Amino acid sequence: AFAEEASGEKVLYYPDFMAESEGETLVLEQEPQRIACLSNAALQVLARCGITPVVITSLSASAEFPEWVYELPTVTVGVNGMDIETIFAYEPDLVIVGSYQKETYGQQFADAGIPVYYTSEGPSITYEQTKQTAIALARSFGTAEMAAEIEAEFAAVEERAAQFTASHQRMRMMIFFSEPGAYQQTSSGYLGSMLAMLPFDNLSDTVTDPAGGTVPMDAETAITLNPEIIFAISPTAATGEDLRAIFEEDFAANPAWQQIDAVKNGNVVYLSKEFV
């Protein structure tokens, strides 16, 4: 394999932005045979590499996987925790999981002598970090060619975004996160970083630290900023239609929202939780 040393060691690479917290690499004594892949992002790359984990996290509805992946045993992993005893029962020799679980479960994995490769995921990760993570995973578990292939796929997306931006007029935009008036997202959030590649000026960047990501907001600020278009996302709404029902009920109950051009003109884009 591309990431394997002559001694039989297996070298897993971290993306640059995680080097400070995790180091540049995770070195295993040998190629792992029983991987518990508790990250959908990592699972997409492992599936492309033809690697079959012994257990996986619940599959994201928005991600596409080969048929065989849907036959694998699953364990629920999320912000509320995970069933670590069930994971131990599969006797993994490597666990891949989001770094947000490290504080709670890292020591238990260490005590059990199970190496852990942490991935970065959630609303605070940017497009660029997502790209770096995918390439690092491909370097670690695939081949140099596969890493180059994935890098080229991201480059193609960026080229399409640049062409779209060059041919469309810019619009004043806000991202409403969770529910109307609860949170806003700057250009450093996951969705915000992708929309920053398109012809949108994120008004939240002008009233809060752009590096803040997803931060609290109030209705008065949104009304004052008066975006031409609003992108709505929520971790609790599986589909855009679910989210539309929540938002439109709130918009109808609070006439003040009609002062915003985007609301008044029906220019609100409701996205599924895959964009969170």
Where do the protein language model's features map onto the residues?
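Extracytoplasmic ligand-binding site segments that recognize negatively charged/polar headgroups
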Residues: 104, 117-136, 170-194, 238
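Structured C-terminal subdomain patch of bacterial secreted/periplasmic proteins
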Residues: 128-142, 148-149, 162, 232-276
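Ligand-binding pocket segment of bilobal, Venus flytrap-like solute-binding proteins
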Residues: 194, 212-239
